[in-house]
From Swiss-Prot:
Biological role stated in the UniProt entry: Co-chaperone that binds to numerous kinases and promotes their interaction with the Hsp90 complex, resulting in stabilization and promotion of their activity.
Keywords annotated in UniProt: Chaperone, Cytoplasm
Organism: Drosophila virilis (Fruit fly)
SMART domains: CDC37_C, CDC37_M, CDC37_N
Bias (Basic and acidic residues): 1-11, 367-388
Higher taxonomy: Eukaryota, Metazoa, Ecdysozoa, Arthropoda, Hexapoda
Keyword check for Iron: no
UniProt protein name: Hsp90 co-chaperone Cdc37
Annotated region (Disordered), positions in chain: 1-26, 345-399
Length: 399
């Protein structure tokens, strides 16, 4: 059986006490509280006085005992003083015991029923997420390359999943994928698929990319690690209200439009780069594009180059004003459409090869053969002087 008697001496509240109608209840409660406070103050004062007496008693007792031990002064008087002090100590013990008994009998009240164990308030806060590292562009690129090298296969597996439950389970098994690098990889993969005209596959990967971006955005809003938001996101997207679902689908459509636009831009950039490379390959010695130069020529000069008729070219240039002829022929030379003195260059190359052959076989020839060879070479040179080969048209020829 439970003993409730100890609760009878608790004086906590007067709110439920019945009072006479003619008595002002708030005033009565106030007087009672004031009397209680005064009793507590008197008790505290009495304890302080006993504490001071105890300190004085201890000091006097030690002092007298030291004098007796050192045999200083009247020993009889000191012993009487010691006896007197010891009697005072007994009286102090009696008074302290009485005070302790009174305190035990004093009913508890709102001021004495409890006291603070400590005056410190501690509020547990979630540890702040680590701030994004301040990386340079090169460091970010290197970090992305390392991530792709280590996780490309897993990223593609995630990108090919279709059901939300499968995606949730896969990410929970590979929490390292829940990061910004995975979203960036899926964006790049979507662009490449669109450039390859794999539109359906691009749309599927785009859906998975938006899921990852929503997880990262949810983590930012809650200020927690993204890995802690995987389950929350998939539960929310599967049980969401129609408005949230509509917003999610709208985000996917907008993302696919941006992917298509970016893929088209990259294709145009690639085509422009290819054309520029081809143009650089076509560039002549003077840095001009032969196709552009040909299109800028007058029709009569175009006809000469198309027919490859040198005589017609000479006649056409002869009929043109000198400054125009110089201008067009210089552009033809700079673009490589026309190589001046090409025949002389070819002739010089042939003669060099012939001399090399003669040098190689010179040791095997007899003096008669050398003379015959020399005679033939001189005749060939004389013939070349009498009938010069056409070496092409240059700006000097125009003058």
């Amino acid at each position: 059986m439970v003993d409730y008697s100890k609760w009878k001496n608790i004086e906590i509240s007067d709110d439920e006490d019945e009072t006479h109608p003619n008595i002002d209840t708030p005033s009565l409660f106030r007087w009672r509280h004031q009397a209680r406070v005064e009793r507590m103050a008197e008790s505290e004062k009495e304890k302080e006085e006993l504490k001071k007496k105890r300190q004085s008693y201890q000091a006097r007792l030690i002092n007298v005992k030291e004098l007796i031990s050192k045999k200083e002064g009247d020993e009889v008087a000191l012993k009487k003083e010691l006896e007197k002090i010891e009697n005072e100590g007994k009286e102090l013990d009696r008074q302290e015991n009485e005070l302790l008994k009174r305190e035990k009998k004093t009913p508890w009240n709102v001021d004495t029923i409890s006291k603070p164990g400590f005056e410190k308030t501690v509020i547990n806060k979630k540890p702040p997420r680590k701030a994004a590292e301040d990386l340079t562009e090169e460091e970010r690129e290197q970090r992305m390359k390392q991530f792709v090298k280590e996780n490309e296969k897993l990223c593609k597996q995630y990108g090919m999943l279709r059901k939300y439950d499968d995606s949730k389970r896969f990410l929970q098994e590979h929490l390292d994928l829940v990061c910004e690098e995975t979203a960036n990889y899926l964006v790049i993969w979507s662009i490449n698929l669109e450039m390859e005209e794999k539109h359906d596959l691009m749309a599927h990967v785009a859906h998975q990319c938006i899921c990852m971006q929503y997880i990262l955005e949810l983590a930012k809003q809650l200020d927690v690690d993204p890995r802690a938001c995987v389950s929350s996101f998939f539960s929310k997207i599967q049980q969401c209200v129609p408005e949230y679902r509509q917003q999610f689908e709208s985000e996917i459509e907008g993302f696919k439009e941006r992917i298509q636009k970016r893929a088209q831009e990259k294709l145009q950039e690639a085509m422009a780069q290819l054309e520029e490379e081809e143009k650089q390959e076509r560039m002549g010695p003077g840095g001009l594009d032969p196709a552009d130069v040909f299109e800028s020529l007058p029709e009569e000069l175009k006809a000469c180059f198309e027919s490859r008729d040198i005589e017609l070219l000479q006649k056409t240039i002869a009929t043109m004003p000198v400054d125009q002829a110089k201008y067009h022929m210089k552009r033809c030379v700079d673009s490589g459409l026309w190589v001046p003195n090409a025949a002389d260059v070819q002739l010089g190359n042939d003669e060099t090869e012939a001399k090399d052959d003669e040098t190689t076989t010179a040791t095997n020839e007899t003096p008669t053969e050398k003379e015959n060879s020399k005679s033939q070479n001189e005749k060939s040179a004389d013939a070349a002087k009498e009938e010069p080969l056409y070496a092409g048209v240059s700006t000097d020829d125009v003058d």
